Each structure stands twice: as C-alpha cells, then as structure tokens.
Amino acid sequence: MTINYPVGTHHGKTLKNNTLRTGKTTKKVLFGKRGMGLEDEINLANDYYLANRLAVVHKKPTPITIVKVDYPARSAAKITEAYFKQASTTDYNGVYQGKYIDFDAKETKNKTSFPLKNFHEHQISHLASILSQGGIGFVIIKFTSLNENYVYPASELIQQWQHLNGKQSISYQEIVDKSFVVPESLNPSLDYLTAVDKMLEALH
C-alpha cells in the first residue's frame, strides 16, 4: 500500500495473579517475549497494565484518507493507496495514577548518540503543550545494539531540541545521565512504568 505524507511533515501496584477475567472464564495472560520490536513490547506492557488495573494506555490510531481500493475478490478489499489526513503527534497516550500521560517510542542502532532527526517539530510542540497542561510527557528510547531502554523526560528532549536547533544528535551519555533506565523484566518484558515512577519522583 502506498502511503503519502502531508506536505511539510517529513520531518506501582501489582496483583498476585496475572490473569485476565473475561466472562465466565479466567485466562492466564503472558506479557513478555524477547526479540520483538519496541512498539510490540510496549503494546504487551500496556495489555499487562490494563489487565492488572495499573494504567490505561493505548496506541493512538493514525487517521488516513483512502484514495484507491482494489477488490481481488468479492469478499476482500485491499487498500492500495492512501494518505495521512494530518501530521501524527506521538505514539501513545492514556491515564496513569490519575494523570494524563503522552509519549513516543523511538529506536536506534547507534551506540553513541540519538539523532534528533527521529523527531519532527510538531511532535516537540505537542509534548511542550502536554507539559504546559500538567500532563506527563516522555520518550521511550531503545538502543537496539546495546539492548538498553530509557524513559527520557519530555522536558529534557525539548531543551536539547532548542539547544541543537532540532539538528545533530543527543549523545548517548547525555541520555543515560538524564533518563531513567527501564529495568529488565519477565512479565512484562518492558516494564516502563517502573522508570516513569522514578522520573516522577525525581521531578517532584
């Protein structure tokens, strides 16, 4: 499927049993799997948080306008061309401990820095707006080559963006110094709320 971007937008608590109750049956739910992408791990973590009543966080849908659809069969339809209605902001939002949270997820294979080109100006503006309203904003950054995950506060990202004029890169050491490491966990495999808790403690 061809996707066309709009012009100018290139750039807590735990329960004893991790179960999900559905109707008359009770299912054991596992929320960890190694070797998957960052977004997949976040999605599984969000499922775990929801099942255990820790937080309600969802991936934001991306609105598109369909231009062309093929019908290879009467019972099937395949979108072959579409474009985004508007520039996307961040990947996830929800509610945690009575607070609105909003964050993005980024990966890099670079071992020494994180390129700011991974962000767009409208995303930085969006995170600034979240902070101005008392919300919680951050970025989950994964250094894939190092298998390290960090919760990087939006306030630090905004400061670096302004300092570097949205160009160049944030050094790995800067991110390590100003971020909160996401500890390795079995279930979920990416327990990012543990790092968010530490971030909130430090900010207050």
Swiss-Prot record:
Mg(2+) binds at residues 89, 91, 104, 123. GO terms for cellular component: cytoplasm. It is found in: Cytoplasm. One of its GO terms (molecular function) is nucleic acid binding. The record marks 106 as: Transition state stabilizer. Its EC number is 3.1.21.10. InterPro entries: Resolv_RecU (IPR004612), Restrct_endonuc-II-like (IPR011335), tRNA_endonuc-like_dom_sf (IPR011856). It comes from the Bacteria. It catalyses: Endonucleolytic cleavage at a junction such as a reciprocal single-stranded crossover between two homologous DNA duplexes (Holliday junction). Its main location: cytoplasm. Binds 1 Mg(2+) ion per subunit. The keyword Nucleotide-binding does not apply. Keywords: Cytoplasm, DNA damage, DNA recombination, DNA repair, Endonuclease, Hydrolase, Magnesium, Metal-binding, Nuclease. Its cofactor is Mg(2+). CDD domains: RecU-like (cd22354). Endonuclease that resolves Holliday junction intermediates in genetic recombination. Cleaves mobile four-strand junctions by introducing symmetrical nicks in paired strands. Promotes annealing of linear ssDNA with homologous dsDNA. Required for DNA repair, homologous recombination and chromosome segregation. Belongs to the RecU family. This is Holliday junction resolvase RecU.
